[in-house]
């Protein structure tokens, strides 16, 4: 289990890095150390590739491609040949490197929460993981960066359209949970860029946008509720209908994960006039239930003891109960007490704890998709991956069929061997996402495109 703890600890670092940590020492980098290095944290059975760059001003950054981390600043940087060190700021267990220059290598240990894993780095930049499905120019369609508004919120995105004058059927892509850019980029994959490319080549106009607080979109995601985000999406539909090359009667929605919660909410809004909806790994049960089952499955897959799983489920259940009861202050105090009760090395950074009880997170935990799914009266495709560990197919497929029973044309399908991103996978673990070259299984792209062209054929 100690090996498992090292793996988990390294993965936990990502939350702190993505949050935008910063800071470095003022020591000038020694010429013998300055520059780029790459190598592996030698976790048994799961080596983790990293790249570290030491700048002339004494600062340093780290890349962890397998976890989607790029150019994350480091602190406590030392670059003497016999003492090379750095630490990742604001991460549980003070993870970092302790080593020295050894000829043309940096050798030492990755240290976190009192545990160590050997590290050897050699000169040179770390290579990006291959992403063979990334669309590459020249594109056989038009691409335009666009902006529009939902009240005080400026929304930025990219609209891709087939060549010609139209009118084209169109769709808005709605991202999954957390702050996502218009490509829904994570772990080096850009699923929404691939989907937009696929559907536009098939004859559809596709709008994909940055979430609140990301890229060119204003606002802050944590301060937004689900009704706020549904209104953002509705503004996207309205924008599409202002374009003369788009058929206003054939505009639909594609939601991934949390986007599968939001798409039916948008369709239920007065005047939305959605023509179709596609839900990729979209939950059909309340958010609290999704999170509890997700914790069970992921923890079990990492070998956690049943007692530890039971404790985590009890914690999530009580926290969810407080949020559903509207006791936000009680939920905040509960999460704070829980974090304070952990050993210092295992505590989450305060900003992570604070993020558990935002309006955005509260919306997720308290949301029940049943009413809006049951209200859908347009063609709907909902599909899952049977190895998904985030939206569990066995938990969601049955309720999805029941909730869509009144829809005039509903298709519910589960793909074998695919994870939450619809990648072919051995286990479905989120830790595998970056290591898989495929962004979305081609069979999924073919299936969804076929479903669309049968129901909303391009003209």
Regions found by a protein language model. Name each.
Residues 378, 389-403:
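Short alpha-helix in the alpha/beta-hydrolase fold that links the catalytic acid
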Residues 167-177:
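Short beta-strand element of the alpha/beta-hydrolase
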Residues 376, 382-384:
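Short beta-strand/loop motif that positions the catalytic acidic residue
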Residues 29-101, 110, 133, 140, ...:
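Central antiparallel beta-sheet cores of small beta-barrel/beta-sandwich binding domains
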Residues 126-166:
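N-terminal cap/lid segment of alpha/beta-hydrolase-fold proteins
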Residues 276-375:
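Accessory cap/linker subdomain of secreted extracellular hydrolases
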Residues 223-244:
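Alpha/beta-hydrolase active-site loop
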Residues 196-216:
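Conserved alpha/beta-hydrolase
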